[in-house]
């Protein structure tokens, strides 16, 4: 398995920022009761529950922010990897800033649903693959959806070279529900708190292996990351180019306006 694949179950998927959205953003994300339900459903697996508030170093902050990792939750992960790897992944996207179709460099993407759709990048439409074409993954998706009693969408990221590719620091503005399923090579996953555009507290780092599932509570998704005055979480993954935090004296804070000019590398 040469590449790293992450398939994200969520209420709203997209092939790239600014491209067509599939589904609608939920009003609420995953709370502790839902996290507990998943823990109980996978009680025969190794469970890691990370309270990310401990990395803020602020004892007065008490908003629920838990990352759940279920190790080797998907036992037939190699079969699913082979099912996914040879699909035609999107390597192009429509850039809103430059108003034209560009090549994807940091990763490739693909959305999944109950139908097939050919890409039309000029009109901001990415490729969609029908679940019937990936029956082994579909079984795992349905298992999770049945546990939660939800009909979730699916969005995939493909990293062909984890030493050169990744995704920069960001929050998931388009959704409140995130369940990541990893296939292929292990890859890093980082979280850090921010306030007023500045990183604060301690960075949390882990590796997500093939067959692992990770689940973000609502706060952990970073859906509120554009609200500068709040304590918010951002995450990143991949090589150092995308995961390094440049914290230097007198350096201009990493604000949303700065990030928007580099959206090509972030998303």
Regions found by a protein language model. Give the residues of each.
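Non-heme Fe(II) oxygenase metal-center motifs and adjacent flexible, charged/small-residue loops
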Residues: 1-267
């Amino acid at each position: 398995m040469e590449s790293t694949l992450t398939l994200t179950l969520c209420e709203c998927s997209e092939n790239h920022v600014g491209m067509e959205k599939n589904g609608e953003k939920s009003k609420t994300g995953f709370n502790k009761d839902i996290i507990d339900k998943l823990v109980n459903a996978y009680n025969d697996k190794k469970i890691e529950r990370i309270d990310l508030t401990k990395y803020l170093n602020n004892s007065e902050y008490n908003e629920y922010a838990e990352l759940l990792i279920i190790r080797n939750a998907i036992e037939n992960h190699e079969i699913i990897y082979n099912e996914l790897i040879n699909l035609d992944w999107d390597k192009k996207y429509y850039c809103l800033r430059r108003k034209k179709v560009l090549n994807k460099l940091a990763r490739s993407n693909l959305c999944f649903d109950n139908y097939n759709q050919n890409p039309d990048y000029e009109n901001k439409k990415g490729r969609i693959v029908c679940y019937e074409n990936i029956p082994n993954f579909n079984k795992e998706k349905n298992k999770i959806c049945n546990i939660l009693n939800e009909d979730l969408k699916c969005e995939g990221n493909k990293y062909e070279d984890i030493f050169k590719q990744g995704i920069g620091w960001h929050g998931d503005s388009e959704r409140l529900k995130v369940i990541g399923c990893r296939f292929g090579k292990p890859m890093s996953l980082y979280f850090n708190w921010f306030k007023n555009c500045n990183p604060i507290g301690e960075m949390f780092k882990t590796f997500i292996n093939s067959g692992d599932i990770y689940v973000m509570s609502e706060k952990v998704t970073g859906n509120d990351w554009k609200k500068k005055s709040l304590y918010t979480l951002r995450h990143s993954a991949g090589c150092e180019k995308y995961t390094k935090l440049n914290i230097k004296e007198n350096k201009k804070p990493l604000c949303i306006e700065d990030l928007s000019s580099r959206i090509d590398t972030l998303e």
